């Protein structure tokens, strides 16, 4: 668990982190927040129960560098689904930013955040 990016993660993930800190300057914003089950949120705002996930191309396409084989790719997809399910059960809003629809400003990101509903479980 870290409060800053320290050059870990994709460049767009670090950009999103900087946007979230600008959107919520008075709130704690955590980078690569470790969940009890070993999964991580890319960016987490605990006070609001909001998680921002940057989904690089490997989240929607098989890429050998990331997955090694198709089983690895399928495991990655299942992991994303499991993270969403766990988040729903705990009332955490998951905002996914896909690599091919990256936002370009804090204002754009805020619009996306506000367009996603909290889970109703």
Regions found by a protein language model. Name each.
Residues 1-121:
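Nucleic-acid endo/exonuclease domains
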């Amino acid at each position: 668990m870290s409060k800053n990016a320290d050059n870990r993660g994709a460049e767009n993930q670090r950009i999103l982190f900087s946007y979230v800190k600008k959107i919520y300057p008075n709130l704690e914003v955590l980078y690569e927040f470790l969940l009890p089950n070993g999964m991580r949120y890319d960016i987490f705002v605990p006070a609001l129960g909001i998680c921002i996930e940057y989904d690089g191309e490997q989240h929607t396409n098989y890429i050998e560098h990331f997955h090694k084989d198709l089983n690895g790719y399928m495991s990655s997809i299942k992991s994303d689904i499991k993270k969403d399910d766990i988040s729903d059960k705990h009332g955490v809003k998951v905002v996914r930013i896909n690599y091919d629809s990256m936002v370009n400003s804090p204002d754009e990101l805020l619009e996306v955040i506000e367009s996603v509903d909290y889970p109703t479980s």
